[in-house]
Amino acid sequence: MSKEQGTKRPAKKATLVVLVRHGHTPTTGRILPGRAKGLHLSPTGESQAKKVAGFLGDIKGITTVYSSPMERTIETAKPIADSVGVKVRRNRGLIEADFGTWTGRKLSDLRKLADWKQVQNNPSGFRFPSGESFLEIQSRMSKTMTEIAEEPRGEIVVAVSHADTIKTVIATALGTPLDLFQRINISPCSVSPILFGSSSPYVLAVNSTGADIASLLPKSM
């Protein structure tokens, strides 16, 4: 074995990505808004955004706050960015799922469709009519997480996105089959920190809405 072959490569520094779902909106739990423009946070959502910004503001070392380009995510990301002294960076990879012709429909109506059972029980084989498939959503989010974690390594970053997109990231990180990802719950303004290192991702918490978020993080960060 040559000296070059025997030399160990230094381990990559881990990047902590703190995933945050946007706050409550007037359509939360009632309508599938998708990528429809003009949806803003409700007063409840604004309060949630300020609250999570206060929690994350206690974390030392956050260098970047990314956001999906949707209004509701930007309005959630802005207080967080202000609390740590940075600007919001829009990242289209974090955008809401494209629900196609289901966009804007009432959830109560969608639950009556035969396709709804597949969305809940076999999402890996489902594509929203004229929209994305769940496999495409998962692939897009995995690519986005890789890009964020590499730019640069060893930092703490916040990524504000949406329920289903965040759920696919958590499922991938845990090695959970996509057909089981609906068992994951992501509440408005909940926090799910994931450590991306040189080996497998390490999920520190899922759907956390408590004040002691900083205690979940590795002491070395």
Each language-model region and where it sits:
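Acidic, low-complexity terminal tails and accessory targeting/binding regions
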Residues: M1-L16, G61, R90, A97-S108, ...
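Active-site-proximal alpha-helix that buttresses catalytic centers in soluble enzyme cores
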Residues: K3, V20-R90
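Short, hydrophobic/glycine-enriched beta-strand segments
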Residues: L16-H22, A159
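Short active-site segment of divalent metal-dependent hydrolases/proteases
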Residues: T25, T165-I166
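Phosphate-handling substructures
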Residues: H40, D82-S142, L195, Y202-N207, ...
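Generic structural signal for well-ordered alpha-helical scaffold segments
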Residues: K50-G57, Q138, S142-E150, I170
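Short beta-strand scaffold positions
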Residues: S67-S68, S139, V160-S161
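Active-site signature of alpha/beta-hydrolase-fold catalytic machinery across serine-
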Residues: P79, T168-T172
